[in-house]
């Protein structure tokens, strides 16, 4: 009898815990000032009520080299994630970063695997290649498990338990005034939608800088 009572108590406790925290979808719509949807903008939600956990040891992400470009151009990982750097090209790459969040160098050869790199410090990691100096990529190390990148419709969908959250966005071409913006959200059991319109246009890309009249790499 005691065993049955104990087992029943455990089941009831688990049931109560399951219903004490709802999961809701937060849809973040990100546009420029003209209302045009923006793709690959990182949306992040920080839980104001709880500490934001570090990723488990098994978390692995991939930053590939394809056609002498970083793929994806921008990778978002949770703090504590390991990142693999495969080389899908038939040429050598020499990937590096001097960013405070992660400093490293990797000589990458086709079909030769190297140990994944641990990204344990939140922040922006800018990637380059010593062999192909036009290559540029980013790894954003998030100190929250709640993040997503916007799709072609400018929508980022994040599933979170109920609570109070702070919403922010990031992209390498965002102005400082837009990356500094914060929105406070109180999330319950119902899905919500949030619109986020940029204050300023995206900064020019490297391709756009190179297209400036009269500029060449030899100037």
Where are these regions (language model features)?
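A short, Gly/Thr-enriched small/hydrophobic beta-strand-prone motif that recurs across taxa
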Residues: 22-33, 202-209
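A short, amphipathic beta-strand motif
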Residues: 26-32, 43, 85, 154-156
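Short, ordered, surface-exposed loop/turn motifs in non-cytosolic proteins
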Residues: 34-59, 90, 133-137, 162-164, ...
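A short, solvent-exposed beta-strand micro-motif common in secreted/extracellular proteins
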Residues: 43, 82-87, 164-174
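Short amphipathic beta-strand segments in non-cytosolic proteins
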Residues: 43-62, 98-103, 134, 141-147, ...
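Short, acidic Ser/Thr/Gly-rich low-complexity loop/linker segments typical of extracellular
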Residues: 58-69, 76, 108, 146-153
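Structured interaction patches on ligand/partner-binding surfaces of diverse proteins
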Residues: 105-106, 110, 141-150, 173-194
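Short, surface-exposed beta-strand/beta-hairpin micro-motifs centered on an aromatic residue
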Residues: 114-116, 153-159
């Amino acid at each position: 009898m005691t065993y049955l009572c104990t087992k029943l108590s455990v089941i009831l406790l688990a049931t109560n815990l399951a219903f004490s925290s709802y999961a809701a979808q937060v849809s973040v719509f990100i546009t420029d000032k003209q209302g045009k949807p923006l793709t690959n903008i990182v949306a992040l939600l920080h839980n104001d009520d709880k500490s934001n956990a570090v990723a488990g040891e098994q978390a692995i992400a991939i930053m590939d080299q394809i056609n002498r470009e970083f793929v994806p151009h921008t990778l978002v990982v949770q703090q504590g994630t390991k990142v693999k750097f495969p080389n899908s090209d038939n040429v050598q790459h020499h990937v590096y970063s001097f960013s405070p969040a992660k400093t490293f160098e990797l000589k990458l050869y086709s079909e030769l695997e190297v140990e994944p790199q641990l990204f344990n410090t939140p922040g922006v990691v800018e990637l380059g290649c010593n062999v192909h100096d036009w290559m540029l990529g980013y790894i954003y190390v998030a100190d929250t498990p709640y993040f997503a990148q916007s799709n072609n419709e400018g929508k980022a969908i994040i599933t979170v338990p109920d609570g109070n959250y702070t919403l922010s966005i990031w992209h390498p071409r965002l102005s400082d005034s837009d990356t500094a913006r914060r929105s406070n959200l109180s999330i319950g059991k119902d899905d919500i939608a949030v619109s986020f319109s940029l204050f300023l246009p995206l900064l020019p890309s490297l391709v756009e800088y190179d297209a400036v009249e009269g500029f060449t790499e030899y100037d």
